[in-house]
């Protein structure tokens, strides 16, 4: 890797890109002694030094022009947080035990998103290992970790990271993260990592001070000037993030990446950074392993999800489908505030369209966005290009009180929606604790210094003031302060709940549906074509149909009304799942209220 500290037979080589600097010194500390080494200026803004006796464990920082001292932006580990020196790490020290593991094909994907700090009481990489067997038994095939990039303080969602190569020390060491991934592979679980390539966090990002070339002031984002993917001197910046992706996939053996909010990556060059990154992954670790790239993209840009003639992804494997969440949420809760307004008129139609065609908005005007056209046509894409879900960290945690959908939805309608998500061809995603209807909230939490903490708290309350429910300042004041330790502690799962009968009913539903998916649906998904179709009747009954790889037809009929109904579309074939016993009335099938039936008809 051209960035950071690299060990070799000659010692440790340190590199820093700082185009505007005249002088850079390397400050080293090991075994109680300190020293400084003058770094050599190279071409294109690089400074470099090789030190023979700087083994793993050595602390180091860079002093720029005799003043500002900064950690390594490509630090592999910062044990004392983001403002302190970095540590030399030997990436070959860990002895892997997953020889022969090459990942799993995408059609197997059942994803479980978790926050390492809130997943277990200890909140560590090592503690998470204890739950891997449970996840595999549930039917999960991939664990997705919320961002790990080093952030300021002891707790954070991860989207305020400033050292993107360094797993945050609050969760454990680099080798302990490798142990977690190694253990997951032993359970046949893939591991994905959420990465943030659209901004750096507000506290601990020194790049603005000494390498402003990392940013392009011509483009603006909610975090300030955009990362410089297309301005002057962008090549080093692009390489920084491409190497970051390769680093996680190769050095840590992650099986895929989820790229956060790529709609805020501004890049007018060609090929853009997403295309170049995907190509680098495909030609690198993806050449011999199953590697999956998943996007979060509010713009619904289908062109990133295209397939070649063999139905292999050209760029990204899939995208989180926020539309299916929003539509299903309106169906089961009736909430229509904020972005849910886009689905309020025909929620079941949008839900069915997402199941069959991918995006709910494929170029139509979005009322929530001022009737601006949103999205691109997606009907030509296969269902595996879209990740479906009813809960994520965003959709739970961005509520004022972090309530999970189980606390606000009609339980019968929610069970029906769960079956639709888990048994439709698109890969499903669960958010930690969803499977047993966890009662704990997932609140927004962070650990900033006093000035920034106050700004975050006030900003969050101001954000919710736009909703009629929070017009009263007194009610705004009840919104939890994200900077308190209590906000973090309340967000931790209480695993004893999973054994309670009421919670176990939910996990049994998930286990049953995922078992059916594994046995009957996943084996028929490889190379599946874009064949989905749907109908909606009176915004109460929903039908969807897909042609699978072997020519068989997967069929869904769902009644989301409060009364039983006779479906117009009759299902023929083997019943894979029925939420209620199949009933006939005068020779015609009857769908009870809030019920779902999946059938499989042979070719």
How does the language model describe each region?
Residues 82, 274, 278-472:
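Conserved alpha/beta catalytic core and glycan-binding cleft of carbohydrate-active enzymes
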Residues 360-374, 430-445, 470-554:
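Glycan-recognition and catalytic regions of carbohydrate-active enzymes
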Residues 79, 99-106, 115-292, 303-304, ...:
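Substrate-binding/active-site clefts of carbohydrate-active enzymes
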Residues 14-16, 553-560:
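Short, well-ordered beta-strand segments enriched in hydrophobic/aromatic residues
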Residues 17-23, 561-563, 571:
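Short proline/glycine-enriched turn/loop motifs at strand-loop junctions of beta-rich domains
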Residues 1-9, 13, 34-113, 120-123, ...:
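The feature marks proteins involved in alpha-glucan
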Residues 64-99, 187, 205-222, 338-369, ...:
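Core domains of carbohydrate- and sulfate-ester-processing enzymes
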Residues 18, 56-58, 586-603:
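C-terminal beta-strand-rich structural cap/linker in extracellular carbohydrate-active enzymes
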